[in-house]
Amino acid sequence: MSIGGVYELAFCRSSLKSKKYFIILLALAAIAGLGTHAAWSSNGLPRIDNKTLARLAQQHPVVVLFRHAERCDRSTNQCLSDKTGITVKGTQDARELGNAFSADIPDFDLYSSNTVRTIQSATWFSAGKKLTVDKRLLQCGNEIYSAIKDLQSKAPDKNIVIFTHNHCLTYIAKNKRDATFKPDYLDGLVMHVEKGKVYLDGEFGNAANLLI
């Protein structure tokens, strides 16, 4: 079976029950260890790097949610500007992540919650790309699923990048996979929408940071 076929089975067949779905993900991990850039996190979530994400995006549009970059008010590093925003180091980290991401996923719509730190993170992640600020992305219960589905319905064939907050990502991982996820700055989750439902595919991580 081709790699693309495995990803199609693992991520696109929403009718699979959770146990069978987990078995398929285990098979995916085994195959990934032989030649793809995928691995498993200690929390049990599949880890997906930008190369694997690009292949996944060929199967269906993806939704990637990132935590914002380093906060100014919780760091001794130099602030970019506003104390409620991010640090200069945070801008550099966001730009580096954005360059690597855009090299493999160049076409996506960009959103952020309505805080200075998420807006700055999104702006530095993708300089020049139109950013849409949506206050619903600050709400981290079931409301965030409604927001994701609404954004995806506006452009069903487009990939989406969202800058949000650690408690949102923690909630999604626990709610969708019963996984304990404590994201660091610029950590992310990969999701997709299928037939009106939102699915969590795994944790996003750069290839250099994955243990294969």
UniProtKB/Swiss-Prot annotation:
Its EC number is 3.1.3.-. InterPro entries: His_Pase_superF_clade-1, His_PPase_superfam, LipoPS_heptP_Pase. Pathway: Bacterial outer membrane biogenesis; lipopolysaccharide metabolism. Coiled coil: none annotated. Residues 1-32 form the signal peptide. One of its GO terms (molecular function) is phosphatase activity. SUPFAM superfamilies: Phosphoglycerate mutase-like. It is an enzyme of class 3 (hydrolase). Catalyzes the dephosphorylation of heptose(II) of the outer membrane lipopolysaccharide core. This is Lipopolysaccharide core heptose(II)-phosphate phosphatase. It comes from Shigella boydii serotype 4 (strain Sb227). The gene is ais.
